[in-house]
């Protein structure tokens, strides 16, 4: 976890010991569940640290402080929880909604957020094109994030309905 600690510090926020433990637990759960559900091709703990956790945290400097302290984020096509879960670990005050079309992946995400002791996390199974019409999700988020979901043009079409006006 040293690489993760150094990287987070370089990005502008030190990790507390309980956050390091959450990342460690996340890595363990990811490797364990990946044996049953194809979540990621990356299973080496050092690579998980760098290619999943740190890569997800590179979004952190772009988040407005108001979002870091209690805004709402939607992670579209969350898959194994990237980038949403690392952002929630780094900024526990955010409200996080994880959206994925696979019920196998959303079962993993639900279990993971429980094991990590996370509050104010919602996991939804479905395609974002359909969920964007759900009244409780439409125009409800300060920030929408995604990783390796679609081209930028298509991703913008997916994300805009979830974003609060303004």
Which residues fall in each region the model found?
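Conserved class I S-adenosyl-L-methionine
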Residues: 68-79
